[in-house]
């Protein structure tokens, strides 16, 4: 039932957008974003950011260190 209600609301909003209802569009989007942020995103965003940052930093550091070490050893030898 929830899914059907959401789809009907989406269709109504799209019709309003085509007709030129700007005020309704902004209010509805803000309410939906706030609800989603409170329920889903805070945990997911923190988890994803930590994972991505750690992986990217570690990979970059190791790649740079390996490249520098290889170049130095080759030059010294």
From Swiss-Prot:
Phosphorylation occurs at different degrees. The triphosphorylated form may be predominant in T2. SP2 appears to be phosphorylated in elongated spermatids, but dephosphorylated in mature sperm cells. Testis. Keywords: Chromosome, Developmental protein, Differentiation, DNA condensation, DNA-binding, Nucleosome core, Nucleus, Phosphoprotein, Spermatogenesis. Residues 20-77 have a biased composition (Basic residues). GO terms for biological process: cell differentiation; chromosome condensation; spermatogenesis. It is found in: Nucleus; Chromosome. Residues 1-21 are annotated as: Hydrophobic. Cuttlefish spermiogenesis is characterized by a double nuclear protein transition: histones -> spermatid-specific proteins (T1/T2) -> protamines (SP1/SP2). The protamines compact sperm DNA into a highly condensed, stable and inactive complex. Signal peptide: none annotated. Disulfide bonds: none annotated. Its main location: nucleus. It comes from Sepia officinalis. One of its GO terms (cellular component) is nucleus. This is Spermatid-specific protein T2. It comes from the Eukaryota. Residues 1-77 are annotated as: Disordered. One of its GO terms (molecular function) is DNA binding. The keyword Phosphoprotein applies. The lineage of its organism: Eukaryota, Metazoa, Spiralia, Lophotrochozoa, Mollusca.
